[in-house]
Amino acid sequence: MASPEPLRGGDGARASREPHTEASFPLQESESPKEAKTFNPEATLSLEGTVNLEDILYLGASGDFEESFYEEEYEKPALTLFIDESRQPDEALGLEEPVRPEEMLSVEESVTPDEVQISEQPVEPAKSPTACEGEMVATEGSLPAQPIPNTEEDPLSVEDLERLEARFQQCVQAVSQLEEERDQLIHELVLLREPALQEVQQVHQDILAAYKLHAQAELERDGLREEIRTVKQKLFKVTKECVAYQYQLECRQQDVAQFADCREALTTRAAQLSEELTQLRDACQKQKEQLQQQLEAPPTQSDGHFLQESRRLSTQFENLMAESRQGLEEEYEPQLLRLLERKEAGTKALQDTQAEIQEMREALRPLEAEARQLQLQNRNLEDQITLVRQKRDEEVQQYREQLEEMEERQRQLRSGVQVQQQKNKEMERLRMSLAEELSTYKAMLPKSLEQADAPTSQAGGVEAQSPGTV
């Protein structure tokens, strides 16, 4: 009887592959939904490491496990399955224990692919023992009688062990290839995620640069506003002084107008006085001529009296003229002097005011030019700020659209991952159900073999008697 050590050696290999199998689940979850649709249950079971794809294909794709076992066991009784009787069926096959690839290989290698004939008719998974016995009898009746080897004393041959080892090496190579594919897919996923992360970082950097430019523009705007406020204050002061000087100029102009009116009045008065003086001179000249004529005439008594009277009148006239002249001089000379002084002062003040106004105009010209330049700069800065805001709004809108696109892609990837996880869970449930069915079939296999041994021995005895009778 062969020991089950080669089969236990496969347990260590299976245990060494279990971490890789567990690590392959995130890779399956991270794949896209399109890739998930190409997976089938058989490939998923091969990725899990418990049942190989070739083993499942070898057992038959058109029927289930029960049909394959019955056809493999009863088509050729000479090549029966080896079962280790030193272990109890409950210990060897548990429902909770995953199916081992080595056990599947031990079941497969007993029957060659050329000897397996898969029935095309569908077979019900739950057959009664009587139906199984009927099929065995029909199969044995169609086959020639062959000697039944003793299953208890026939161990595994060296060729079977070599084939098992080769098959195990193939499984190990397949697992390593799957691990390489998993690493490659993880690397591709990382490479696919890197552009999105770089785009997000670039967007954040652009937003920070836009905020910096905005802050710098605001600082420049505040500085220009402060300069404009200072220039406005200076301009206000200059305007205030200009208005004050203009008021003084108007006052001086009014004084000059008043002085001109006084001058005209004095000129008119002087003309009147000159006319009166001329008239008085004419009258005096006439009287003088008359008196001279009287003097030239022969003197008479009346003439002496007239001469005395004329001398008296002449003296009175001279006294009157002197008094009137002195009165006029006393009355108008101070006013004339004051008017002359005021005229000179007004002329001098007017000249000073005109000089100051000219200086202020010359000083106001660069300020006006500077104010126009500052207004132009202010308009340019406002236009630049408007353009920067528009550009920032456009960039923010573009960044938002890109962010929405990336969020949409992220949602799609998440939905694909969820679909893949759900499919993986379904595959896991299918694998567990297949493993449970396989363990159930393995548990039922010894009983079916025992039931098949009795009809086979009876058929052999009948055939042995038939040649004797002949």
Curated annotation (Swiss-Prot):
Principal location: cytoplasm
Chain residue ranges for the region called Coil 1b: 220-297
Location of this chain's protein in the cell: Cytoplasm, Perinuclear region
Modified residues (Phosphoserine): S32, S314
Induction entry: Up-regulated in dystrophic muscle (at protein level).
Region feature Coil 1A, mapped onto this chain: 158-192
Disruption phenotype: Displays no obvious abnormalities, have a reduced capacity to generate force during isometric contractions in skeletal muscle.
Region (Coil 2), start-end ranges: 338-445
Protein name in UniProt: Syncoilin
